[in-house]
Amino acid sequence: MQQKTKLFLQALKYSIPHLGKCMQKQHLNHYNFADHCYNRIKLKKYHLTKCLQNKPKISELARNIPSRSFSCKDLQPVKQENEKPLPENMDAFEKVRTKLETQPQEEYEIINVEVKHGGFVYYQEGCCLVRSKDEEADNDNYEVLFNLEELKLDQPFIDCIRVAPDEKYVAAKIRTEDSEASTCVIIKLSDQPVMEASFPNVSSFEWVKDEEDEDVLFYTFQRNLRCHDVYRATFGDNKRNERFYTEKDPSYFVFLYLTKDSRFLTINIMNKTTSEVWLIDGLSPWDPPVLIQKRIHGVLYYVEHRDDELYILTNVGEPTEFKLMRTAADTPAIMNWDLFFTMKRNTKVIDLDMFKDHCVLFLKHSNLLYVNVIGLADDSVRSLKLPPWACGFIMDTNSDPKNCPFQLCSPIRPPKYYTYKFAEGKLFEETGHEDPITKTSRVLRLEAKSKDGKLVPMTVFHKTDSEDLQKKPLLVHVYGAYGMDLKMNFRPERRVLVDDGWILAYCHVRGGGELGLQWHADGRLTKKLNGLADLEACIKTLHGQGFSQPSLTTLTAFSAGGVLAGALCNSNPELVRAVTLEAPFLDVLNTMMDTTLPLTLEELEEWGNPSSDEKHKNYIKRYCPYQNIKPQHYPSIHITAYENDERVPLKGIVSYTEKLKEAIAEHAKDTGEGYQTPNIILDIQPGGNHVIEDSHKKITAQIKFLYEELGLDSTSVFEDLKKYLKF
């Protein structure tokens, strides 16, 4: 099941349908695009995202996000007021951006939506959906199936492909860079392929074949940014399109996926704490679905299938962490579940994959990555500790029962291929050029003791030959929400910073998911301040152990990570010199008080219900960044916001910026002459949205800001980036 499991595990912690074998299988909350699974470096106008079979692994699924957009024209006066002109020495960064934009694509790690089915590979080439014979996939000998420009969209790209079992049809989900709306097109495959149908606002979708060899497409539909309806459709001479299921509870969302063996189509109904799964027989898709287990509050579960048995990843029982259970497919209810495999305490289940004779679990324990290979014939377990430099998995979809391929990466190291071969019982790594970063940098796993004594893990990177680390600049990363891990995928600009002498620190605070479900529970609702205490402890510990100093320390956060970063700026502004925030969630109270937003109900499990619970309201007031702005000294802050962001209210970011500038002005007035006012920059990107790809302009602007605020020479940055581009 591979990336689908990863999707599921993240979906359990945040609301809307996120990460997996394809964008639709992701489940995102209001304020986080998690991750899109992997870092995608956009070089031209097309998104190229690479997978290996008929279950592509890419980014997000249901965009069940409330639209809170404001026109660029309306915001222009505010933008002009809050933005400061770029410094004259911006030339070096302009060169960097120009170099990035003109660099040939082949010099980058490109990820492309690519699906193998039968003897063909289906993928995007330019602005077309194409296919080629498997052995010819690396050349230009391909067949054009559909031109995306027929949809008359601005810069369209494919983020998911599904091929019908007998290859009579292919379905592709298409969206644009500037919008989260998507269209699913159905292409009839023949000597002259033709678009037979298109459906708007499709989230997840899967093909099955019925008893009469007719292809049936099941798909979920979003209405008012909520994914509650399941449809099934047929094509050709027997066309029909009917609603199959509707979820009535607005706090739940629905998504679909096939078990890896394609035996069952699963309908997954879930919110942050509870799930329910129905099975549709892949051989009899018109039969009524079968319920696995009726939803029980607090019980989460995910289902896979092999040899007439269901394998269920669930948190039922004690401890309330994920464990693997098993039952016969014809007796699926919870009373029949037998414990099959248990994880150690404080272990995060990252992914799970089923093979003919093996089950493979990808885990994180003590801030290190492991692979556990379970022999299904004899219940044997082989645990492999992965290289200590690795911080993230990238799963390859794979139908080969003999091998389990995957990639490992870190923020400063591009993905490297590994394959576990079941017959040999060994892990093999890709041979070839060894990345020089392995010798020129160090990765450290440290811990900080929080206010209540809890040990908080940190991952730290720096150059091997760095001397006097106390005088080096430090960039601290934080997230701490929705049970999601802090993103540690490869980022070229992070590598550039390390090459230029920076220290990178990733603080895995409570509220995230690095140590399992309990780690998340200890940092949400009325325990949110634990995450803030953890962040403060991490920064103080780093300084205490000789890593940088407050005047050279910077902090960065994205989306919901802005809550803790913004709270730190209010509570301990002296710890950092500068902060960069991207699409930050900064006004928790007013957003959660607005019950007219379609997804507020889904967010209550994370932030609480301030509208009806006075305890929740008062607690949110204690840490909400917007509510706690006061006249005092603040670090300089660079905020990147997107005009068409459908997850974080742009109006709230503008209000936060205005209130912050007023507080700083009042403090400056009280302090008198000689006070150095911090720079507060609001960069509103027109035409973007919460899931927009990293643009070179944005990256260089953020790097420029950090260097300027710390008074550092930026000359070497361009040289380091040129070295990276030759990779």
UniProtKB/Swiss-Prot annotation:
KW Protease (keyword) present: yes
Active site: S559 (charge relay system), D645 (charge relay system), H690 (charge relay system)
GO BP term, example: regulation of synaptic vesicle exocytosis
SUPFAM superfamilies, alphabetized: alpha/beta-Hydrolases, Peptidase/esterase 'gauge' domain
Effect in UniProt of substituting D645A: Loss of catalytic activity
Disulfide bonds: none
Keyword Cell wall biogenesis/degradation: no
EC number from the UniProt entry: 3.4.21.-
GO molecular function, one term: peptidase activity
Keywords: Acetylation, Congenital myasthenic syndrome, Cytoplasm, Cytoskeleton, Disease variant, Golgi apparatus, Hydrolase, Nucleus, Protease, Serine protease
Top enzyme class: hydrolase
PANTHER family: PROLYL ENDOPEPTIDASE-LIKE, PROTEASE FAMILY S9A OLIGOPEPTIDASE
Complex and partners: Homodimer. Interacts with the AP-1 complex.
Involvement in disease: Hypotonia-cystinuria syndrome: Characterized generalized hypotonia at birth, nephrolithiasis, growth hormone deficiency, minor facial dysmorphism, failure to thrive, followed by hyperphagia and rapid weight gain in late childhood.
Protein family: Belongs to the peptidase S9A family.
Protein name from the UniProt record: Prolyl endopeptidase-like
Phylogenetic placement of the source organism: Eukaryota, Metazoa, Chordata, Craniata, Vertebrata
